């Protein structure tokens, strides 16, 4: 007769389900791992392996195994990179968890559990990160079908409310805050009071002292309308793009200097090697301190000039609540100030140099040393000489088919026809084009043709609204003709003094100028790749990397290999040839499958704007010439606004500016586009807004009309007509409705 007690103490049959892993460590600079999980029952020799998942840090397996577990047995679940396991003993290890015998009984039948991955041993040098999700079920409780589980939901409850985890194209994890509309690389954590046992992941070694927590009752950390989430992401991209649209950013501090802030918010600079501190910004030469401030233009938004009790001027940054003695405009515009000083020195030298018998040998002020506004003025003069005195470039399109109809008409024309005065008409609308309709056309068209939806372009990064050519654009058989069209439109915008609403990466503009690309250009486009390549150059890679002169590219899910040089797959990267490898890699990264597309775009652009006219500009200046200023300076807007039938003290005017200051950057841009036809500001600021017959300031016109009417815009005259609304709330509501809902032109 069998003994029930003896049977109960024998091996127990359990079903282990290995569902997925998350946030695995990325050990290769340029490739993602091929993870698989290995299950070993220590003591009995049972061993199982999951399938291999290609190129991911978040593999999903959902595979189960029936295990016989003895009383003293433990289970080790390890994760490995299939690409590396054949290299040497222990290669490819990505982390493991070990379930001790007494913890197995407590894990059993508790649903899916999240376990932190850890090292094989405490002295192991391998970097480990991430979690694995598993479940243990008694064999007699296993049903005919398993529960379908969304792996992503198992991890969401670790994040604070309103946060979302995303992954960039290079595999790096970033965190999106939907409340503040910001992104960051560091994983956000909940306050201590928010942590509770159901949300805490398990330790990698699980024993009787480790609390067992389930995920069945976990709630998703962020749930929202997908359309709202997409709108928030686009708004974030828009803000990030516009915040970077400046001519030149302040240069880095000299080596050995650090910028610090006192407890009172005063900014100072410390030389770490000598311990000497100073209030003066070391990036700015001291002889520039007495420069005329009017030459530098207005202060940045949120800054104010004040005087100390002794009369010394200092600057208050209300954005960061700090003060400093150095004018913030000096560091941002240092290149212009130095250029201007060099120009004056050259002029002084010319005055003391005797006249040369040959005029060609006389000293002149180099054109490239003039500031951007002067160079742009010269460009406009040279372009105006090319414009025919008679005839028009007439284009009639519908708003619904603006992309295709514009493409067909523009591509039919000869390049010299595109130089004629631009006359745009929207079908079914009676607007006369004195500039405003053309600005509206370019605004709408640029939104369409640059939209990644059409496959011609793609976002360069997940967190900023800059574009690059899509290497897989060939899915459209006519893609080269469309790139030719895009180049023509960009050239037409520059030629006729308008702007494209959108922007590319700075290396794109550099290539458009015919300049070579360097490693430094990679930093803004792909920071992770830039850091990896810099690390290769600055460190001895002997025995560390096993790369060859062959790189991989993911094209719609298919992994394609590209050799950087002939037979590159068999040429290892060594300490001796690593500089060549980095140079070839950078060139391939920026021209990866886009050579033909870029040449077609460049051809269209140069058909309208000859390349020799752009030799004096750098890539940042070219970006501003094509796209204008994205950052809207409300102070400059106010100063350069004309009032008609109202005064600065009129309620309509005060309420209008109150609404503008309340708007975020995106709504300010929409308001500007509603009134002027373009969301971009000229390089010289609002004083350079163009109307039907030359410069025309932004105009607020109070009209005698029913207060139930919406404000009305006259884009050809940069004028907005506003009825005498009874309250700020009504003006705000009507103004918002007008800029969000209305479109179309009419003739009065």
Curated annotation (Swiss-Prot):
Activated by NDFIP1- and NDFIP2-binding. Its EC number is 2.3.2.26. One of its GO terms (biological process) is protein ubiquitination. Residues 157-190, 251-284, 297-330 form the WW domain. Pfam families: C2, HECT, WW. Induction: Up-regulated about ten-fold by activation of the TNF-signaling pathway in vitro. InterPro entries: C2_dom, C2_domain_sf, E3_ub_ligase_SMURF1, E3_ubiq-protein_ligase, HECT_dom, Hect_E3_ubiquitin_ligase, WW_dom, WW_dom_sf. It catalyses: S-ubiquitinyl-[E2 ubiquitin-conjugating enzyme]-L-cysteine + [acceptor protein]-L-lysine = [E2 ubiquitin-conjugating enzyme]-L-cysteine + N(6)-ubiquitinyl-[acceptor protein]-L-lysine. Keywords: Cell membrane, Cytoplasm, Isopeptide bond, Membrane, Nucleus, Repeat, Transferase, Ubl conjugation, Ubl conjugation pathway. One of its GO terms (molecular function) is ubiquitin protein ligase activity. Gene3D superfamilies: 2.20.70.10, C2 domain (2.60.40.150), Hect, E3 ligase catalytic domain (3.30.2410.10), Hect, E3 ligase catalytic domains (3.90.1750.10). Residues 1-119 form the C2 domain. It is found in: Nucleus; Cytoplasm; Cell membrane; Membrane raft. The second and third WW domains are responsible for interaction with the PY-motif of R-SMAD (SMAD1, SMAD2 and SMAD3). The C2 domain is involved in autoinhibition of the catalytic activity by interacting with the HECT domain. E3 ubiquitin-protein ligase which accepts ubiquitin from an E2 ubiquitin-conjugating enzyme in the form of a thioester and then directly transfers the ubiquitin to targeted substrates. Interacts with SMAD7 to trigger SMAD7-mediated transforming growth factor beta/TGF-beta receptor ubiquitin-dependent degradation, thereby down-regulating TGF-beta signaling. In addition, interaction with SMAD7 activates autocatalytic degradation, which is prevented by interaction with AIMP1. This is E3 ubiquitin-protein ligase SMURF2. It comes from Mus musculus (Mouse). The gene is Smurf2.
